[in-house]
């Protein structure tokens, strides 16, 4: 059955879309990777081109990850995922797509499937310096680089950095930039990570989807957003536990959120709410005071939480809070 599906797909794709793909010169560096412990798949990329995240990275939970760049043929992304989802390895899928592409010489593409099979292609007419390095559970690729050492620097950084998939891919991007990066400069970046426990529902499977569309230092900004993303992951868990009245768990999550993003007063605010619900008023009051000084509207909002059951205190305690 899979053979029939793939055959039909190839006929439909290459007879209908081969001539209408939108080729765009996304000279860049990127990484595709699999975390074999968690099953997470990801792509991270930077380019001196607007909105690189809308074209280069393609990831599907439980299937694979693809980066399509140089003179981009976007079709490699969705078409490659379909082929891998229907049982092809990354190598087989990339081979088929390249064979059907008359302009493969200007393409740079990397694919990894859920089993860790990796394939990469750097066309002979990609602009120097252009190359790729394939390693266990990853591929790094770059074109139009200032120095030929960029891919190897990315590979070493990914292999040697200790952390989760986002940390390791971020290390690879930073290593590329430290080697000179894109010879034209820097403009946009993106990171996409999909869950290792696929549900088949895209929004549920998306662990991270961050895009820097246009920025003088997109790598630095992407790293900042990753930190904020982690903060809100903990904040969202805190909200969940607060709804369930699991106050100890909520306090733990809000504390972590505040540590990741201390410059946002709303995150410690919810920590103070959780502490008040635990009747730890002396711990909550100084946090409320600091938060209210930074954002007076949070003070106005506080009494409204009682009506919805998010703040479980009596009027006496509320008055103490409102006096801060």
What would you call each of these model-derived segments?
Residues 18-184, 191, 213-244, 259:
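Alpha/propeptide regions of enzymes that mature by internal proteolysis
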Residues 243, 277-278, 311:
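Register position in tetratricopeptide repeats
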Residues 236, 270, 304-305:
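Canonical tetratricopeptide repeat
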Residues 262, 296-297:
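Short coil turns that delineate tetratricopeptide repeat
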């Amino acid at each position: 059955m899979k053979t029939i599906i793939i055959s039909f797909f190839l006929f439909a794709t290459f007879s209908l879309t081969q001539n209408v793909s939108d080729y765009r010169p996304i000279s860049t560096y990127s990484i595709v990777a699999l975390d074999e412990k968690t099953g997470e798949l990801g792509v991270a990329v930077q380019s001196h081109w607007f909105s690189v995240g809308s074209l280069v990275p393609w990831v599907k939970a439980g299937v694979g990850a693809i980066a399509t760049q140089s003179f981009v043929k976007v079709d490699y992304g969705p078409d490659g995922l379909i082929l891998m989802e229907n049982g092809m390895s990354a190598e087989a899928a990339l081979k088929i797509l390249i064979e059907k592409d008359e302009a493969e010489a200007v393409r740079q593409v990397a694919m990894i499937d859920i089993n860790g099979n990796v394939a990469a292609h750097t066309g002979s007419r990609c602009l120097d310096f252009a190359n790729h390095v394939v390693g266990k559970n990853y591929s790094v690729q770059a074109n139009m680089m200032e120095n030929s050492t960029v891919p190897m620097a990315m590979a070493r950084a990914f292999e040697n950095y200790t952390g989760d998939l986002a940390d390791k891919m971020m290390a690879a991007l930073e290593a590329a930039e430290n080697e000179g990066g894109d010879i034209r400069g820097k403009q946009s970046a993106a990171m996409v990570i999909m869950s290792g426990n696929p549900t088949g529902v895209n929004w549920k499977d998306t662990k991270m989807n961050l895009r820097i569309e246009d920025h003088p230092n997109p790598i630095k900004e992407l790293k900042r957003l990753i930190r904020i993303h982690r903060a809100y992951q903990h904040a969202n868990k805190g909200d969940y536990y607060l709804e369930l009245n699991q106050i100890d768990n909520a306090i733990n999550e809000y504390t972590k959120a505040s540590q990741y993003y201390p410059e946002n007063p709303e995150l410690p605010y919810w920590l103070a709410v959780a502490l008040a619900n635990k009747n730890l008023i002396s711990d909550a009051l100084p946090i409320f005071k600091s938060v209210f000084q930074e954002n007076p509207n949070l003070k106005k909002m506080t009494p409204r939480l009682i009506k919805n059951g998010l703040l479980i205190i009596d009027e006496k305690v509320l008055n103490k809070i409102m006096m801060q």
